[in-house]
Amino acid sequence: MAILGLGTDIVEIARIEAVIARSGERLARRVLSDNEWEIWKTHHQPVRFLAKRFAVKEAAAKAFGTGIRNGLAFNQFEVFNDELGKPRLRLWGEALKLAEKLGVVNMHVTLADERHYACATVIIES
């Protein structure tokens, strides 16, 4: 396997909180997949949940080398946890098509958060 891309992102949690205070659920609706949205609505720390997912999706877009444009959208990247709790990434729509075109066979996700920040790194392999 070869590394195709590496992306990292850091998010200030207070910034996400401010956007939610200003615009309500709009950011969450734009960023989250349908499955993530259902979790977010009842999550005990919804701002932190959204900040972490935002960081992963930005990192993934950077790893793919595209950013969020040309048909790619945040909600086409879905963060979920495997049976051991490890964060994983599932792709939909144009993101899935791009991964198939690039020959992506594996994606690695690491995610961390502290009081003020959430950060993520995504590595994609062919």
UniProtKB/Swiss-Prot annotation:
It catalyses: apo-[ACP] + CoA = holo-[ACP] + adenosine 3',5'-bisphosphate + H(+). The keyword Lipid metabolism applies. One of its GO terms (molecular function) is holo-[acyl-carrier-protein] synthase activity. Mg(2+) binds at D9, E58. Keywords: Cytoplasm, Fatty acid biosynthesis, Fatty acid metabolism, Lipid biosynthesis, Lipid metabolism, Magnesium, Metal-binding, Transferase. It comes from the Bacteria. One of its GO terms (cellular component) is cytoplasm. The keyword Magnesium applies. Its EC number is 2.7.8.7. It is found in: Cytoplasm. It holds the Pfam family ACPS. SUPFAM superfamilies: 4'-phosphopantetheinyl transferase (SSF56214). GO terms for biological process: fatty acid biosynthetic process. It is an enzyme of class 2 (transferase). Its cofactor is Mg(2+). Belongs to the P-Pant transferase superfamily. AcpS family. Transfers the 4'-phosphopantetheine moiety from coenzyme A to a Ser of acyl-carrier-protein. This is Holo-[acyl-carrier-protein] synthase. It comes from Escherichia coli O6:H1 (strain CFT073 / ATCC 700928 / UPEC).
